[in-house]
Regions:
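Catalytic-core "active-site belt" of small-molecule-metabolizing enzymes
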Residues: 1-119, 123, 130-167
Length: 167
């Protein structure tokens, strides 16, 4: 949880990191909520170890959430989307239905066998979609979860500030 941020910018080590849009389940005392986040990852370190590469970067999330109960019956119709901005050019980076991912209740039951809910205070990133045109670093990353049934969107964007790697 210490890596989660709604900040408009993150700092990363070097220039070899990139975002990937994911639905995010947030378990609070009043139930399950859905958000959208970026599992920002150091791609060079990923060749050494996935877990290590994921722990190195902040995890930007949109500051708004939807009640899971509001979308559970039409979950497969939700759409994930991300854009990468590099050199001032915005390009579609990922797009597709969340139906391509495992449903949140299945993921939660895999995490906690015998139940399909997370303990309050827990957050779970729920998987990502393939990248269009290859993984690439960017100066800004924008994420979105669209609900075409209720005609609404969760959005967040963040700038990526690379820090020099010395030594």
């Amino acid at each position: 949880a210490s890596l989660l941020t709604t900040a408009p910018a993150i700092e990363v080590a070097g220039t070899a990191s990139s975002g990937e849009v994911e639905p995010v389940v947030v378990s609070l005392a009043d139930g399950l909520w859905i958000g959208v986040g970026s599992d920002h990852t150091d791609r060079e370190l990923e060749t050494v170890g996935v877990t290590l590469s994921k722990q190195l970067c902040a995890k930007p999330v949109a500051p708004q959430l939807w009640r899971y109960a509001e979308v559970e019956d039409h979950w497969d119709r939700l759409v994930l989307r991300s854009h990468a901005i590099q050199g001032g050019k915005r390009r579609l980076y990922q797009e597709g239905p969340v139906a391509a991912l495992r449903p949140p209740r299945e993921l939660m039951s895999r995490y906690r066998p015998g139940t399909d809910i997370l303990p309050p205070g827990s957050v779970m990133f729920c998987g990502t979609l393939a990248v269009m045109g290859g993984i690439a670093a960017a100066e800004r990353f924008e994420i979105e979860l669209e609900d075409p049934v209720l005609q609404r969107r969760l959005r967040h964007g963040y700038d990526i500030a690379p820090l020099p790697i010395e030594g």
